[in-house]
Amino acid sequence: MENDKGQLVELYVPRKCSATNRIIKAKDHGSVQINIAQVDENGHAVPGEYITYALSGYVRARGEADDSMNRLAQKDGLLKNVWSYSR
C-alpha cells in the first residue's frame, strides 16, 4: 500500500514464483530470489541492470528449479538451445 506521497508503507510485499505464478508466503523458508546481471560486450556487469527470478520452496522441493530456471532464461533470451525433457 502507498501513502498520499507515493511511498511504499507495507512491511511485507508478497512475491510471486516466476515458474508457477503462485504467491510465495512469508513462512516459505525454502524459496529463493536470484538476480542475473546484464553484461556488456566486454563481459562486465552493467550496474543496476538485472533480471530477477523468484522460485518457491514448492518448485525447489520437487526438483524442478533447474529446469524452471532454464525455461525462464530461454524465454527472456539469456540462453539458447537448452535441452529440456518436456520437449
From Swiss-Prot:
Which example biological process does GO assign this protein?
A: translation
| Gene from which this protein is expressed | RPS21
Q: Where in the cell is it found?
A: Cytoplasm
Gene3D superfamilies given in the database record: 3.30.1230.20
Query: What is the stated purpose of this protein?
Result: Required for the processing of the 20S rRNA-precursor to mature 18S rRNA in a late step of the maturation of 40S ribosomal subunits. Has a physiological role leading to 18S rRNA stability.
Instruction: Look up the coiled coil feature and give its residue ranges.
Output: none
Record-given protein name: Small ribosomal subunit protein eS21
The Gene Ontology terms for molecular function here are: structural constituent of ribosome
Quaternary organization: Component of the small ribosomal subunit. Mature ribosomes consist of a small (40S) and a large (60S) subunit. The 40S subunit contains about 33 different proteins and 1 molecule of RNA (18S). The 60S subunit contains about 49 different proteins and 3 molecules of RNA (25S, 5.8S and 5S).
Keyword annotations for this protein, in alphabetical order, are:
Cytoplasm, Ribonucleoprotein, Ribosomal protein, rRNA processing
Among Pfam families, the record links this protein to: Ribosomal_S21e
Q: Lineage of this protein's species? A: Eukaryota, Fungi, Dikarya, Ascomycota, Saccharomycotina
Gene Ontology cellular component list: cytosolic small ribosomal subunit
- Please state which protein family the record places this protein in: Belongs to the eukaryotic ribosomal protein eS21 family.
